[in-house]
């Protein structure tokens, strides 16, 4: 999805410095919104995607309104502490959604952005403007750095600070009953100087279903359909393993396996790949685990799959044949392979990371204490849990001892720490 923020190198743009090469696109924006120049002076095209384009602009009437509802500590932190040295112009980001996007999709995004106001770790919507079939969302302008510029240099305490704000934002999103669906470094604006970050881009977000997945997930749903007479297994499970099907039904009454598969390749959870219909905010937590794996292995992106099948095979090489087989059954699917390099059991995280980074410099495993490394691996294991109902929640993950060991504040979530009793006491600090 499209990132709506500029990197540090472009943050010092003045109102008179309109980029020459961006003028045609800015002219199209002004043509689509004839009155936009009355409120905002557009200075730069940040980027454009399939569904939207984003511009940097000066808010002409910033001092005329009460901005306290969206001016978070994130915005304050990126400004000079001396108010007399603060820039005269206050920048915002203008996200223009193309008319080809379904109105219902635009409405959902606006409703979610409005509902999510109030968190320092989630991008707050300032306002929205509509002119005929054109919609413009006004958002805060936040300085950030590219993930590739710092992820290989970060120590465990710095990784902890990064994950703190990411998980805090996800906890807020989850509490509102929303699934982001596209958590990745490109959708988390991180400022390495202030050590703060915000989650952005809710173009794929969805409201979470009321029914959370059971321990047996899709299997329980299929059983319920059979009991209600809405599903009949014409080709029994036991027979399809031993023999090929004798034929195919002309009018098959069985429901097809349809589920939302939106997201970015390499960051989608196994239940998304197996087309589970009971997806929850746990898919966002899985994406956080992939980001942590990128930090620990110095590999980004870590997974380089081209399609869903390749993605499942990549996971199988880490979690083993047995793990993926059980995961598939959980979602009403069958996993079978003849890959000779595939092991039956899951790889040990420490061994995997060590083998990948053995020739790298600034190794986290060598520069951090054994206690911190062990806690990081334990957190990674809880984030990358194949079973969605057993995967740690974002709010619970914030209480993990890893953050305390790295000197990272737990961001105001004062729940009882559920990890103190289950983490091995044999690990020495």
Swiss-Prot record:
Alphabetized InterPro entries for the sequence: Kinase-like_dom_sf, Prot_kinase_dom
Subcellular location: Nucleus
PROSITE patterns referenced in this protein's UniProt entry, alphabetically: PROTEIN_KINASE_DOM
EC number: 2.7.11.1
A single MF term (Gene Ontology): ATP binding
Example of a GO cellular component annotation carried by this entry: cytosol
Example GO BP: meiosis II
Predominant location: nucleus
Positions annotated as active site in the UniProt record: 182 (proton acceptor)
Domain of life from the UniProt record: Eukaryota
Family matches, as Pfam families: Pkinase
Family: Belongs to the protein kinase superfamily. Ser/Thr protein kinase family. CDC7 subfamily.
Functional note: Required for the initiation of meiosis II and progression through anaphase II.
Name recorded for this polypeptide: Cell cycle protein kinase spo4
Species this chain originates from: Schizosaccharomyces pombe (strain 972 / ATCC 24843)
Taxonomic path: Eukaryota, Fungi, Dikarya, Ascomycota, Taphrinomycotina
């Amino acid at each position: 999805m499209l990132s709506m923020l500029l990197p540090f190198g472009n943050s010092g743009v003045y109102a008179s410095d309109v980029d020459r090469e961006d003028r045609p696109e800015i002219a199209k924006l002004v043509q689509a919104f004839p009155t936009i120049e009355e409120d905002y002076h557009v200075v730069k095209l940040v980027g454009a995607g399939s569904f939207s384009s984003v511009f940097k602009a000066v808010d002409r009437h910033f001092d005329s309104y009460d901005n306290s509802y969206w001016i978070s500590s994130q915005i304050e932190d990126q400004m000079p502490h001396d108010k007399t040295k603060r820039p005269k112009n206050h920048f915002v980001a203008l996200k223009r959604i193309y008319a080809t996007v379904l109105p219902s999709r635009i409405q959902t995004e606006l409703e979610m952005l409005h509902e999510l106001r109030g968190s320092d770790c989630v991008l707050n919507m300032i306002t929205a403007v509509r002119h005929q079939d054109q919609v413009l969302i006004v958002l805060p302008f936040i300085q950030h750095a590219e993930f590739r510029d710092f992820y290989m240099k970060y120590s465990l305490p710095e990784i902890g600070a990064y994950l703190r704000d990411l998980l805090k934002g996800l906890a807020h999103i989850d509490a509102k009953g929303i699934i982001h669906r596209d958590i990745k470094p490109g959708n988390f604006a991180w400022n390495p100087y202030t050590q703060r970050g915000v989650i952005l881009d809710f173009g794929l977000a969805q409201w979470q279903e009321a029914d959370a997945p059971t321990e047996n997930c899709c299997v329980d749903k299929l059983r319920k359909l059979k009991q209600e007479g809405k599903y009949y297994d014409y080709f029994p499970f036991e027979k399809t393993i031993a023999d090929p099907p004798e034929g195919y039904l002309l009018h098959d009454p069985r429901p097809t396996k349809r589920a939302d598969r939106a997201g970015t390749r390499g960051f989608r959870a196994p239940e998304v790949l197996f087309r589970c219909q009971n997806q929850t905010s746990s898919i966002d937590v899985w994406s956080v685990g992939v980001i942590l794996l990128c930090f620990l292995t110095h590999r980004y992106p870590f997974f380089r799959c081209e399609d869903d099948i390749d993605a499942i095979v990549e996971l199988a090489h880490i979690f083993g044949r047995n793990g993926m087989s059980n995961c598939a059954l959980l979602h009403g699917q069958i996993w079978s392979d003849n890959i000779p390099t595939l092991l039956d059991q899951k790889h040990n995280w420490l061994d995997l990371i060590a083998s990948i980074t053995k020739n790298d410099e600034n190794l986290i495993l060598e520069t951090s204490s054994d206690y911190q490394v062990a806690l990081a691996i334990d957190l990674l294991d809880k984030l990358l849990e194949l079973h969605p109902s057993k995967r740690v929640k974002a709010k619970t993950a914030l209480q993990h001892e890893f953050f305390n060991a790295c000197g990272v504040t737990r961001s105001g979530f004062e729940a009882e720490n559920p990890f103190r009793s289950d983490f091995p006491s044999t690990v020495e600090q």
